[in-house]
Amino acid sequence: MMKKNHRQLHIIYNIAALLGLLSFAACKTPQATLPKDTIKASLPVATSDTVSAIPVWRDFFQDETLRALIDTALNNNQDLKITLQEMAIAKSNILAKRGQMLPSITANMSVGASKVGRYTADGAGNVGTQITPGHNIPTVTPDIAPSLQLNWTIDLWNQLNSDKRAAVERYLASEDGQRTLKSQLVADVAENYYSLLALDNKLDIMLQYIKLQQKAVQIARVQKEADADTQLAVEKFEAELAKASAEEYELRQAITETENNLNMLLGRYPTPILRNKENLMNKQVPTSLQTIPTSLLLKRPDVVQAEHQLEAAKWDVDVARKAFLPSLNVSASLGLDAFNPKYLLHLPKSLAFGVIGGLAAPIINKKAIQANFDQANALQLEALYNYDKVLLSAYSDMTTLQAKAHNLAQYQALKVKQADALSKAVIAAQQLYTYNRATYLEVLDSEREQLDCQVELVDTQLRQLSTLIDLYRGLFSLQG
């Protein structure tokens, strides 16, 4: 008998040793190599200014009407509301990952009955056996068992912790995504508002030009009646008047479209927007804000968002790598068990419990685990390249817009000189035409050139403001 027991123990030890060796073999995990981020390392170092250069949008935009519109957009915009729900989802995912690290405890209530065959080991053994003093085991035996069940996957290798960290990074990325969208919304509202003011100014210029052409038609008719000019001159001025009148309605349509686009950003149905067109041309474009240190690029929400996504991908690789390691699961139960409810509280006789632990390690056919690891590694590289792309794009946009801001300032100064000269030329041409010393073509050309120059001045002012807004798109502080 002792030899038999010894042989059984020997077999058990051999099996345990084999399982131990197999588990050790299964502990070999692949290593992911992430290349050095040369793009971030080679980012030009800032030589001036500090983070305090980020403008608060309320200070940046002095127009009270625009401030009110931005406030409305930040409160009502549907895209922002969608991102809030995405953040809530990401936050819930953190709680779910955190919950996976803790043991789960469930309450169970089991009620049943069983009957075993008479000619079985259990059936034969139960014959004459008393379940309580003076009472044999009934043929049909009830079973009532309230209990608590515990299941726990012990995080031996911090795999679950890595999964939670990935969820945290994704939540932070969603926060920065919302900051990016908010800053984008501020910029979009401002650009649409200034575009609307620019169209108002263009319409005002066009209406003045139409009045000028109406007067020119009258003068041409007087000149023709006095035989100082021909019918051709009258028709040319009338054609120019018709052309200007058509452009008026084109501008009115553009105003309607821009106003509706702005209302869409505000999260409301088309509503007239009260505004003062003078707020565009009177707006001073601050040149001191046209230089942004490159260090601020690393603090842009879109760049920080891409960085959090990269960190999340790194943790995902760690989770996939640790899937090659053995996992330890513990299950336990504690409860009461009796054939009759009145015996449930007869402690400790009615007490029932059990504990079991299991160590599981992948040994054969790891293709699925390897595929998950390869996928996580590829996604990590993709996140790195996306981060580099966002950073390169931010820097490229910044340098382009800084040059654009400088060149537009020079362009506008020259356009102002051109407008002054053309204004004098129009007056001179009109006077000369009245005295029959200039042709109608010279008058038309000078008036059309003046119109084009005035429109270009409005466009230049708008482009300067849009350029400055684009420079700080993604950098606006949302305080205040």
Features from the language model and the residues they span:
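Sec/SRP-type N-terminal targeting helices
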Residues: 82, 98, 154-182, 232, ...
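A small-residue-enriched
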Residues: 27-41, 74-155, 257-273, 292-371, ...
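Alpha-helical heptad-repeat coiled-coil segments that mediate oligomerization/polymerization in large
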Residues: 227-230, 394, 401, 436-440
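Short segments within alpha-helical structural elements
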Residues: 217, 243-271, 417-477
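Periplasmic alpha-helical coiled-coil/stalk elements that build and connect Gram-negative outer-membrane
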Residues: 3, 28, 178-292, 404, ...
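Transmembrane beta-barrel architecture of outer-membrane proteins
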Residues: 66-68, 89, 143-145, 191, ...
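Terminal intrinsically disordered/low-complexity segments used for targeting and assembly
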Residues: 2-75, 252-295, 341, 473-480
